Amino acid sequence: MLSGGEPLQPEEFEVDGARVHRLRLNPGDTTVTYSASAEDGGPPRAVTPAEWATALRPSRYCPSDQLEGFATTEFDRSLPRAELVGTVAAWVHRRLVYTSGASRPVDTAVDTLLAGQGVCRDYAHLTITLLRALEVPARLVAVYAPGLSPMDFHAVVEADVDGTWCVVDATRLAPTSSLVRICHGRDAADTAFLTLFGGGATLGELTVTATADGDLPVPDDAPFPLP
């Protein structure tokens, strides 16, 4: 990490299990390079009571209280949980057109539904909002996604399926079984890859590369437990 030509010493801490680096930047250009290798992360994550409560509530980009009437008339809440989660993800996939640059940083799931287009975070926000409106706890997960095209940071959804957090990706741009968790939260407000305080900056260049050993499976709507 370099800022204004000088090495940076980041302060590192955890927020909800995610690693956060806090930096004090010098005037001039700042360059941050990060690399890592990941292996099987262990067993699926159980939904805790605190997570259950938080993941049911409306949030900044996921105003589920505004879409409750729409969701309950559009979907059958009596479906088995895994089937309901997959059905909502498939519906969002059909309803939206993936369009780079089509959405604004302030757009909510309601804006996305009306526009009918967006990028991965918009797909995730709409999926989360509909699931919460159907009383299914759901949250956003920022991930590295081998097989994603175009390659970038990626946003997917975790939903409570019979007490276990399971991933669905309404974009179908990357296989869920190859995803590597970066962090999770209520929505994009909790999971931004970069947040600035006390000054201004321009993002000059961003390059993300994520690869996996072996062949990648075909993306689908089946919920998958992400370690």
Task: Say what each PLM segment does.
Residues 90, 122-200:
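Hydrophobic/aromatic-rich core segments of domains that either
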Residues 32, 42, 46-118, 126, ...:
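Secondary-structure boundary elements
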Residues 1-2, 34, 71, 168, ...:
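Generic structural hydrophobic/aromatic packing signal, biased to beta-strands
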Residues 3, 22-23, 53-59, 161-162, ...:
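Short, surface-exposed linear patches
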Residues 1-69, 135:
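Linear, non-domain "peripheral" regions
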Residues 8-21, 66-75, 174-180, 192-197, ...:
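Low-complexity, flexible helical/coil segments
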Residues 8-10, 27-29, 60-65, 166-170, ...:
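Short, surface-exposed, polar/charged, turn-prone segments marking secondary-structure boundaries
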Residues 4, 25, 98-100, 115, ...:
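Generic structural "secondary-structure junction" signal
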